[in-house]
Amino acid sequence: MEPFDPAELPELLKLYYRRLFPYAQYYRWLNYGGVTKNYFQHREFSFTLKDDIYIRYQSFNNQSELEKEMQKMNPYKIDIGAVYSHRPNQHNTVKLGAFQAQEKELVFDIDMTDYDDVRRCCSSADICSKCWTLMTMAMRIIDRALKEDFGFKHRLWVYSGRRGVHCWVCDESVRKLSSAVRSGIVEYLSLVKGGQDVKKKVHLNEKVHPFVRKSINIIKKYFEEYALVGQDILENKENWDKILALVPETIHDELQRGFQKFHSSPQRWEHLRKVANSSQNMKNDKCGPWLEWEVMLQYCFPRLDVNVSKGVNHLLKSPFSVHPKTGRISVPIDFHKVDQFDPFTVPTISAICRELDMVSTHEKEKEENEADSKHRVRGYKKTSLAPYVKVFEQFLENLDKSRKGELLKKSDLQKDF
């Protein structure tokens, strides 16, 4: 893949926003069929420009205005905020207290740095194929709960461009949720609790909630290959001591003896399971199958940035924004192929600009002469960004179908009266 040089970013962004950004689909998403008057016009966008210049409360009348502004500013990063009571770009003219965030998608932000206490391969901003499995498990667990436990239909998963993933839940009813309800949802989805000083972050008992059981079933599919082989979490004393800190002291000696006798993480894990589930230890109310589950959850369960989800007015990085450090595009993820998603094959801005350059001069000239934006944005179709835009379009199709279904229902009800 084309190496990315951050020094070239200003020039690359010009080309990206002029020829490659999927404006039509982007506007179609945030306009939500134009059902609610001024929905798009009251949406906040924020731009981060070169040298960390940050501009909040941007808003636009239509797709064309958004395009012009983005091509003029060439933002390093785009964030999407709430739909407000008034146009965000006029917030200074509104009476104090009257300018209120009214609606926004329910969003989730999962960042690999929050797993630094349990991943051995990388730390801070670094990721590799070994620890990416954490994101796969997180997406599977959260998506299943949003779909089955809450009945949310329209969930867009997006790669952040570096070390994490975001989820946008776009159902109409969800966009109207209060901050209190959002807090309740994120609380339901949170199991790993406590800061750096807290060693044991997951606490279960005999009454295990169905959400937890279903999450454990997902983790089980990945646990051996990810945790026992890939991360080798019981490789040596330093590592098994971390796990001993999560189980009752009454079984420490028995576990230690087995850990010293066996020579691999899978064998040592099997020993831990037997000890935790032995009839002798089960008499101790702290032992049982939930002991191994607590360890699995602490090492593999999603770690959400709670504050991002709670606030209606919280900004989150936009899909199709470019990560200024890696150059990777923040692309939608095809959830049907979530296990195959590889962050290292996500196109960089340098790669897609190069691909565009390789299009014949004749074709380019023909396109440049096309005045209207409908033709100009076809540029992405000639690059490796195309399949990701297709994923986005499929998501939009489902949103449209759902909206039409709701409108038909409403008109049928009115006919009945």
Curated annotation (Swiss-Prot):
It is an enzyme of class 2 (transferase). GO terms for molecular function: DNA-directed RNA polymerase activity; magnesium ion binding; ribonucleotide binding; zinc ion binding. It comes from the Eukaryota. Mg(2+) 2 binds at D109, D111, D305. Mn(2+) 1 binds at D109, D111. Pfam families: DNA_primase_S. Mn(2+) 2 binds at D109, D111, D305. Zn(2+) binds at C121, C122, C128, C131. A ribonucleoside 5'-triphosphate binds at residues 109-111, 160-166, 314-317, 323. One of its GO terms (cellular component) is alpha DNA polymerase:primase complex. PANTHER family: DNA PRIMASE SMALL SUBUNIT. Belongs to the eukaryotic-type primase small subunit family. Heterodimer of a catalytic subunit PRIM1 and a regulatory subunit PRIM2, also known as the DNA primase complex. Interacts with PRIM2/p58 (via C-terminus). Component of the alpha DNA polymerase complex (also known as the alpha DNA polymerase-primase complex) consisting of four subunits: the catalytic subunit POLA1, the regulatory subunit POLA2, and the primase complex subunits PRIM1 and PRIM2 respectively. Within the complex, POLA1 directly interacts with PRIM2. The bound zinc ion is not a cofactor. It is bound to a zinc knuckle motif that may be involved in sequence recognition and the binding of ssDNA. This is DNA primase small subunit.
